[in-house]
């Protein structure tokens, strides 16, 4: 027990400086609990407010697609150049070294494949297992306008409810319904519904016309999906336009690991997202690093 006779009365109380409460920097996240904000701060760089996620969760429905045949050989060398990893729990446990020290957004929906209806997903991971894996968020697909729209929205609701109990953020990933055009109106609808259900981050697609309306109408951070493989210059232009129009990051897979020079491409994306560089300057960086 401490010697009570040796306890000195405190003197430096800073009486002329009231304690300050700094608002949390991330859009739509100011009212969240400390643990939730802490995990979001792992994902979104506190200095820039933005993020670069490396997505390599495609195998959960595509299998060993090009570039993902061997995660240990082709993807692991990229870890140090990204902010966040997005993968499944199977890959996380079997391939990702624990000493990687990168926050993880865990793919938490599944139970489908490219051979069946893609929108027919279920929650595939419990929040308890996500906590065991020490991840920073859980992600699930939401398919507005699809055959299984209702179930996909329920999946988001389930993750939000369970995650809120333990301080675990949820990222909703917008899929495209069969009969919906891939345009601003559709993605405004899909992102807003996901946010209204309580998702803390929305991953969606960039569109050439009206993307600023999508980000303005969504009360939580939007990160863009990379989508299909594009020429590097076009992919960087997409990144630049998305950030310029209000996206707070990118979650790219094929445009990174299917690039001729994945590390150079990640450095170029970093220049756009965190450095504010134009696509032209970032592409020159890519060529220099290639």
From Swiss-Prot:
SMART domains: DeoC. It holds the Pfam family DeoC. Its EC number is 4.2.1.-. One of its GO terms (molecular function) is fructose-bisphosphate aldolase activity. Gene3D superfamilies: Aldolase class I. The active site is at 203 (schiff-base intermediate with substrate). It comes from the Bacteria. InterPro entries: Aldolase_TIM (IPR013785), DeoC/FbaB/LacD_aldolase (IPR002915), DeoC/FbaB_aldolase (IPR050456), FbaB-like (IPR041720). SUPFAM superfamilies: Aldolase. Keywords: Lyase, Schiff base. The keyword Lyase applies. PANTHER family: 3-HYDROXY-5-PHOSPHONOOXYPENTANE-2,4-DIONE THIOLASE, FRUCTOSE-BISPHOSPHATE ALDOLASE CLASS 1. Belongs to the DeoC/FbaB aldolase family. This is Uncharacterized aldolase PM1278.
